[in-house]
Amino acid sequence: MWSLLIVRDIIYFGKKTFGEFLESDEGIATNILASRLVQLVQTGILEKKPHAMDKRKEVYALTEKGLDLIPILLELANWSAQHDPQTGAPQVWIAMVNEDKEKMIRRIRETVQRGGSIFVGSDSVVSTLGVEHE
């Protein structure tokens, strides 16, 4: 479960550092987070690089193998939107994803490869599409 949440945080929220992952609402313990990051790097889902501005920090990014998880996360979000009235995904976003899923997957993939995310930042997917997100 934790590994999927780390991948989700990269794709949906643009998190990249140990500290950012640690701040997630789910409250992962530091030792579990460290272990999962090592596993994700070892299995080729993430790559670890020095932080561009602070060489004492490391940033994590999805590899091609990791980017291939985007469709799975979109399907989980779609399922959640259908079955959980408390879901955080805007309905207009879900509708746009379902309208042309392959196009949206490509757009998300390109955005994440550039260091962006679906929901956070001025260059996020929802910002470029004009979708409101809380």
PLM region spans:
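N-terminal helix-turn-helix DNA-binding core of bacterial DNA-binding proteins
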Residues: 1-29
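A general secondary-structure boundary signal
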Residues: 1-9, 41, 58-60, 73
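Active-site micro-motifs of SAM-dependent methyltransferase domains
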Residues: 12, 39, 68
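Residues at helix-coil transition
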Residues: 12, 42, 78-81
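Residues within the helices of the helix-turn-helix
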Residues: 19, 38, 58
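Canonical helix-turn-helix DNA-binding module
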Residues: 24-51, 55
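Basic, amphipathic "hinge/linker" alpha-helix immediately C-terminal to the N-terminal HTH DNA-binding motif
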Residues: 52-75
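C-terminal regulatory/oligomerization modules of transcriptional regulators
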Residues: 71-134
